[in-house]
Amino acid sequence: MKNVNSLYAILKSKNYWVFLKNFKKSIRMKIIGLASDHAGYDLKIFIKEYLVKLGYTIEDYGCDSSISCDYADYAHILGYKIDRGEIERGMVFCGSGNGINMTVNKHPAVRSALCWNAEIAKLARNHNDANVCSLPARFITELEAKNIVNVFLNENFEGGRHLIRINKIPLFYKQ
């Protein structure tokens, strides 16, 4: 009976539920969603293999080849997954990074940043709490992409004055 009471006390404690919430979040953080069009396909596959080696679980929403296709078809799937809270981070790839970035940013829970170098990725995470990184496949090397991805995944949001600013982003949708 003592063990049952101890277990009950643990389950009732606020600390247990905070731990459980953070544990579930840490598991979701290890899942990275990827999406691309044909121009970003090769870089997406390179980054996908790299992330798997780092221990991440990848959900690849397409495209599946370098045959011409429309980035919106795949960006919306990733955006929808973030909106529903099924994943917390994503990476999108197209030729310039712009089209797929604009599309995924139409989703209310997405804060996607076009990152062409590691410094931009750092600021996007620190100041904007970006949860999607858009990579311009025609303008960066594989090594640059790896550096951007590493920074994007390892930097944290600073909060403070930046939190006030990003909280104003979705106000338009609430009106």
Segments and roles (model prediction):
Residues 29-32:
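Extreme N-terminal starter segment of soluble prokaryotic enzymes
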Residues 57-68:
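A short beta-strand-loop structural module common to alpha/beta enzyme folds
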Residues 74-114:
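Helix-adjacent hinge/juxtasegments
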